[in-house]
């Protein structure tokens, strides 16, 4: 039997030439976006003032299973892709488990995460359309960094609204984004109408991704030749991230390995959706029975404690309405250290798959997450991002179950990025000052009270 190497590296020639679209495989596609004024399904014209034309086409495409990746995007991808698929031999040994553990590492670029996969695609299409300026939000900073890299490469101006608490926790993220040419504004800010309103209603707030989205959208609609781009949640972002799963499946197929469990952290859902796409497509066609697990923070539990309802994607309630698992656009998450998971909602694709019983969701508290992150970095040598460490936590839990039952399951998880800008969080954990935040039912009800009444 061929020994599986520590790292399974694909060649440059094996880089996927197509993204995979999960929606055509689903028995029932996610509900369409709803125009919050007319309460009718959004058309391309409804979305055109905010998003790039080609991205709108991808967003609304429920038909094509594969979409070709333009050569210019593939050329950019080759600077950091294919990314390594690693067999976690050292972690397996430390856990004393018969399970095989694999992780797909997306932190091999300067942004430190998977976010660059969609950033380069979105900026490329903006450039093709002749746009000169983009706006966006960022939580932990990986998306903002990725987009600043892509904008610097293609020569487009960028304004980034960064969740305030994350900006304070990770000041050097701002320096990196500015080095690539971006303008970075902590959110909520006094530079927008919605920011000023949120500050007035929630003095001292640390902000949220929903709030930052509102500010970025407001600026995009008031700036000439400008569009807004989003780093997660939307269908086209999940599409671009499918390259993660496609490479993962190709690497495993080389050695005849079939996963039993696939695990991903879930904030907006794009990395999870991208990782599971080819495996879920096969499951939907009856070709496997993989168990999928979405892992979210206990402090922002949209899947495990949220409601499946139409909701706005932003705090300012300016986006189209999306049917998703949500805590309500007015929900303000506690200032936990997983900035990239501080979002009230969830990808409509991931939400629909979860609602249809195609995957499980778990929430974990951050002290348990950092316990797993610490063990992982000591075994595997990579300092993981807090977001990624949610998947590590559950992968370890599943491996421990295998130790107890004697089952030799194959566990695959997404290591979405590195934690080098999260050292304050690691320091808090190491010093024993980290505190778990879990919203009460009363806290959640405040968010649910902001849900719009929609009949569709």
PLM regions: where:
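Buried hydrophobic positions in well-ordered alpha/beta secondary-structure cores of metabolic enzymes
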Residues: 84, 103, 115, 122, ...
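Active-site-proximal loop->helix
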Residues: 135, 143-206, 302-312, 423-431
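Positively charged, low-complexity intrinsically disordered leader regions
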Residues: 3-131
